[in-house]
């Protein structure tokens, strides 16, 4: 058995869902590896805290949006929200990211997804985020939204926002690779704001308990901004960026597909929006679509009698088509909507964008 075959299997391995002697042995080995990993993380953080490692400015204010754990915490909708908030305030934001998964000269899936939902906002992908920020400034940006920046301490920031998934806030409370924590919860002391994502997925008592746990991890410091957000479908988008109302799904016969960690949840969302699902094809998370996949999907769409093909934005930017088998193809756009602290967080984002650049 491969220890890390895909993100979903890795999560089930670390949370104990995979049982038997093989997974148990793998967990024991991963626990051993997590010890030196923790030492490295601690040493690196101490070096930054004591200024033994240099922190560089990007030339303009920087707003970082990151997380404490591996895997999806709903960070991408927050990045899009921050970029829109800044643009609405008259700023010229650019998004800077590492560009995970992209080959040199190519655009990452995440960058392509953000280009659809926040058109006109430059996106610079660079392993060296300081260089990326400075490149964005040369393209006219007066504020940087740093994607996945919490652990990238080399680039100075004016606001540090951390997203925590309400359904698994602390990654099994174990450091990688035994768990999903990229660094210990005590690192939340660095955060200026914490956003509880997928907040509607848990009850009020659980949300309050997570907030108390965050404050405890910060040594009792409750001064951080606290916000709660949920991921809700807001529109349908095609590959050209065109917007379509969600009402188009109601009573519509659709053929759907998705390559995400929880494809059943996507199907449930479509059903909840009133779609009549004639065919549904799940793929593995992060699936790379080949010509054979697209031909098979087109055949499925045609034979199902669907009037519309629907997928996720994450998949649409990989498929890069306006139709499948002559049937229009659209993606469900998900956005972060705040139930607690949204106005305060927006004000903090705008205020940080007006800081004196370092």
Per-region residue spans from a language model:
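A transmembrane-helix-recognition feature enriched in membrane-embedded lipid enzymes
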Residues: 5-59, 352
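Walker A (P-loop) phosphate-binding motif
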Residues: 46-101, 200-201
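Phosphate/Mg2+-binding loops and adjacent switch elements
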Residues: 91, 95-220, 226
């Amino acid at each position: 058995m491969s220890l890390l075959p895909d993100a979903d299997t890795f999560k089930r391995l670390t949370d104990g869902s995979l049982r038997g002697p093989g997974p148990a042995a793998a967990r024991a080995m991963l626990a051993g590896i997590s010890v030196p990993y923790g030492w490295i993380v601690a040493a690196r953080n101490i070096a930054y805290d004591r200024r033994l490692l240099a922190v560089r400015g990007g030339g303009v204010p920087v707003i970082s949006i990151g997380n404490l754990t591996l895997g999806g915490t709903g960070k991408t909708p927050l990045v899009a929200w921050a970029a829109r908030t800044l643009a609405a305030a008259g700023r010229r934001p650019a998004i800077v990211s590492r560009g995970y998964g992209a080959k040199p000269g190519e655009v990452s899936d995440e960058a392509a997804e953000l280009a659809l939902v926040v058109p006109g906002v430059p996106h610079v992908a660079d392993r060296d985020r300081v260089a990326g920020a400075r490149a964005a400034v040369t393209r006219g940006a007066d504020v940087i939204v740093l994607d996945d920046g919490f652990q990238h301490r080399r680039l100075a920031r004016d606001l540090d926002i951390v997203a925590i998934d309400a359904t698994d806030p602390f990654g099994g409370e174990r450091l990688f690779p035994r768990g999903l924590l990229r660094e210990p919860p005590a690192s939340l002391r660095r955060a200026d704001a914490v956003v509880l994502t997928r907040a509607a997925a848990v009850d009020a008592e659980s949300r309050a308990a997570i907030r108390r746990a965050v404050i405890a991890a910060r040594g009792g410091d409750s001064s951080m901004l606290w916000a709660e957000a949920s991921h809700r479908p807001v529109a349908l988008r095609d590959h050209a960026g065109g917007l379509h109302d969600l009402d188009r799904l109601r009573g519509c016969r659709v053929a759907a597909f998705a390559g995400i960690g929880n494809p059943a949840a996507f199907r449930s969302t479509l059903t909840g929006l009133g779609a009549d699902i004639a065919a549904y094809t799940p793929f593995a998370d992060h699936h790379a679509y080949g010509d054979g996949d697209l031909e098979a999907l087109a055949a499925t769409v045609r034979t199902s009698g669907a009037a519309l093909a629907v997928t996720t934005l994450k998949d649409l930017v990989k498929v890069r088509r306006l139709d499948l088998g002559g049937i229009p193809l659209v993606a469900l756009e998900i956005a972060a909507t705040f139930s607690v602290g949204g106005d305060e967080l927006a004000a903090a984002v705008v205020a940080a964008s007006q800081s004196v650049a370092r």
